[in-house]
Every structure is written in C-alpha cells, then in structure tokens.
C-alpha cells in the first residue's frame, strides 16, 4: 500500500529537529529497525541543515519542502529548497568539502546521505535551489512496532 506525506516549514535551524521527528513518526508505520530509523533521521537532519545553512544562507524567509512516500518496504524522501543552488555539485559531494568553514561545518552531509541511503540523486540549479531524492529499502524485519 502506498502512503504519502508532504511537509513545508520555514528555513529556521530549530525546525530541523521537527522535520527529523515528523519524518521518523511517519516512517514508523513500516516498522523499520532502529538502525534504519536512525539512519533516515540522520539523513533528514543533514539535508534540512544543508538547505537552511547553504541553500538559504540563514534567510528565515526561505521554505524547506519534504515529501515522503512509503511503498511496501521502501521509503522515498524528497527534500527541496528554492535557495541559491549548488555552484559545483561534484565538489560539494566530496567528503570534508564545505563552503562555510567559519561555521565549523564538517562537510560530510552528502557522504552521510550516500552511506545511509540506497539511492541518492541531487539536482541543483544556481538561483533556483536544490532537490535531493533519497531512497531506502527497509529490511522489513518488523523490528520496532510489532
């Protein structure tokens, strides 16, 4: 059975935890393992933080959009902003690369997403924003809820 959720919120750093918990609560109905749920929560945190810090450069008037689609044991996440986009996507996806060293950012966001998810697609256009499509196939072990 397919189920879908859409969420939008202001690009404020305090909304990162709201996004993470909301997505986790929605995904819980698939009964993921604790490890799977933790990985998805981490990926949501990374993507939302990137949108707020890099996409909107701290402009709270921006909006972050999240879509979650559940199908059987598959989770599809789309996290989108309408910020400044990514100038050099290949460079941005390199471990430890950051455009904000003064904020003590580690530059591991995309690396974490790629390691925790089964599929990662990043589409970015300068001045039009960034969309990240993430897919995770769950083990379907009935670990948390049953």
UniProtKB/Swiss-Prot annotation:
Protein encoded by which gene: spoIIAB
Protein name (record): Anti-sigma F factor
Domain of life: Bacteria
GO biological process: asexual sporulation; negative regulation of sporulation resulting in formation of a cellular spore; sporulation resulting in formation of a cellular spore
SMART domains in UniProt: HATPase_c
Organism: Bacillus anthracis
Keyword tRNA processing tagged: no
Record field: catalytic activity: L-seryl-[protein] + ATP = O-phospho-L-seryl-[protein] + ADP + H(+); L-threonyl-[protein] + ATP = O-phospho-L-threonyl-[protein] + ADP + H(+)
Listed EC numbers: 2.7.11.1
InterPro entries: Anti-sigma-factor_SerPK, Anti-sigma_F, HATPase_C_sf
HAMAP family, alphabetized: Anti_sigma_F
PANTHER family the UniProt entry points to: ANTI-SIGMA-F FACTOR RSBW, ANTI-SIGMA-F FACTOR RSBW-RELATED
Root EC class: transferase
